[in-house]
Amino acid sequence: MRTLKIEPLTKEAFAPFGDVIETAGSDYFMINNGSTRRYHKLATVETAQPEDNAIISIFSAEKLEMPLRIRMLERHPLGSQAFIPLLGNPFLVVVAPLGDVPVPGLVRAFLTNGRQGVNYHRGVWHHPVLTIEKRDDFLVVDRSGSGNNCDEHFFTEDEQLLLDPQSNQ
């Protein structure tokens, strides 16, 4: 079983999968009579159908036991999905490129710095939210509308991957 190498999350490395949502290194302009920096359009919400709505939710996630066998990935074919950490904790991101099914050899893992969020582009394969704290909260921006917006792919036992944060140290 291949152990995923966990990479630091950067805009350049994550670009094939979506957007890194962060203020560091991002352009801004002043608003509110000069008292507020607006970091504008850090990510774009994608929706596939005209009647779709962009919605905001909060996910409260429990830590999964590590090392973790990556048995499945999911994708949202009708809209993007963004996760922004509310408690400032780093979290793990596991992704694979667009395609009919995720290719195990192309799966990548990233570690955020706690001040970064991610916006998965429409159709990008990813693991459900992976907190490394006992519990963590995320502001989630995604799509509401008709049609199935969650495809799941389960790997065969031979294709499964291992996510082990301790192996990177």
Curated annotation (Swiss-Prot):
Keywords: Lyase, Purine metabolism
Pfam families reported in the protein's UniProt record: Ureidogly_lyase
Reactions catalysed, as given in the entry: (S)-ureidoglycolate = urea + glyoxylate
Top EC class of this enzyme: lyase
Highest taxon above the source species: Bacteria
The protein's Enzyme Commission number: 4.3.2.3
Entry keyword Phosphoprotein: no
Pathway connected to this protein: Nitrogen metabolism; (S)-allantoin degradation
Cofactor or coenzyme needed: Ni(2+)
GO biological process: allantoin catabolic process; purine nucleobase catabolic process
Signal peptide: none
Keyword Lyase included in the entry's annotation: yes
Gene Ontology molecular function: any one: ureidoglycolate hydrolase activity
Role according to the record: Catalyzes the catabolism of the allantoin degradation intermediate (S)-ureidoglycolate, generating urea and glyoxylate. Involved in the utilization of allantoin as nitrogen source.
PANTHER family: UREIDOGLYCOLATE HYDROLASE, UREIDOGLYCOLATE LYASE
Family note: Belongs to the ureidoglycolate lyase family.
Oligomeric form and interacting partners: Homodimer.
Protein name per UniProt: Ureidoglycolate lyase
Organism: Pseudomonas aeruginosa (strain ATCC 15692 / DSM 22644 / CIP 104116 / JCM 14847 / LMG 12228 / 1C / PRS 101 / PAO1)
